[in-house]
Amino acid sequence: MKITTRLLAFLVLVLAPLALLSSAPAPKRAAAKKGQYLAYVGTYTTKTSSKGIYVFGFDTATGQPSAIEVAAATPDPSWVAVHPSGKFLYAANEAGKASTVSAFAVDGKSGKLTLLGQIPSLGEDPCYLSFDKTGKYVLVANYSSGTIAVFPILADGRLGEHTALAKDQGPTGPNKERQEAPHAHWIEAGAHNQFVYVADLGLDRVLIFKFDATSGSLTPAAPLTAKAPPLNPLSATLNPGAGPRHAAFAPDGKFMYVLGELQSAVTVFANDAEGAYRAVQQISTLPKGFAGRNDAAEIAVHPNGKFLYASNRGHESIAIFAIDAKNGTLTFVAHVLTGGKEPRNFAIDPSGQYLLAENQLSNNVVVFKIDRATGGLTPTGQVVEVPSPVDLAFWPRE
């Protein structure tokens, strides 16, 4: 299948006046118990029995989870992320036009969360949030409205007035049901904090913005240059109908792996000497001959940079790929069933020893041991019961 590159038709960028607010410093991390982590689970609360954000302990020496409990009651926290300082946790609360981003203080021993404040997400249905590399800003992707926003983190952990707001506009993909409009689904800062990357499911594109870490502002993608025709070095386009959902970078930043939800495929982009991302491979996350319904969901590169994992909702599996260190291309290794239905998300523990799969419709988190030599996954028999799990974030336990 031919991979094309199209220039973004329109991009509306709104830069908000900068408020004179104190930004959060980069405090030292608290001393952690060796191999002991807190695992925070984001959930959907609407039409489920979930109360909000859950937490359980996880011991990487044994692979044993501890008893799970409610860390904070909050509506539909579909994405959670722990600040690099370990002092704060932020959650995206999906609520249509009333969507918010919540800030919590973290108790590093018990895992309990204390609400610091909530602010509007400046869009509808935020589904992803992350931090810039300085830890001074929260980056938010609002799915239904196709907008992204940047918020400064104040010294007490609360979020200040936005420093940037952008709405994606332009030609949408061919899937009339899912690509009727722009849908920002993932946002991350690059390794050097100079660019912010946004996967837009509706546009079949990863948008790339210049990021100013001093002001928290974003600037539009640069126009075409004679050195790299016809590729815009600050955008990357997938096949029509791919529906980019999430992406992951190689540890050295040379390769970007974009998961297409609608076509259940990973597109590999290589970063060349001119700073442009060029598509070099597309590979399916499904076994040959599979004809059932499937929506690819999550993607992650193992900490050792040798393997890539992607989840399939429908086939109910994790696809495992080996990464070629020279050219970044993928070779299929295996499919492993997740032990439940609708694996919307999974997370690899920071030590790289375990993968935890969140099965949304079977209300469980299933633990797998990772073979760090082959990338293989083996279920340990450990299962954590939690209502409608859709995201998981690890943090070292004090």
Model-assigned labels for residue ranges:
Residues 57-63, 104-111, 151-160, 210-219, ...:
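Short loop/turn segments immediately following beta-strands, especially the blade-tip
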Residues 66-72, 114-119, 172-177, 222-226, ...:
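A short beta-strand motif characteristic of beta-propeller blades
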Residues 66-135:
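Blade-loop segments of beta-propeller domains
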Residues 44-46, 94-96, 143, 153, ...:
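Short loop/turn segments immediately following the C-termini of beta-strands
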Residues 29-59:
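An edge-strand/N-cap motif at the start of beta-rich repeat modules
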Residues 48-49, 74-85, 122-133, 137, ...:
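Beta-rich, blade/repeat-based domains predominating
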Residues 361-366, 373-398:
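Blade-level signature of beta-propeller repeat domains, shared across WD40, Kelch, NHL, RCC1
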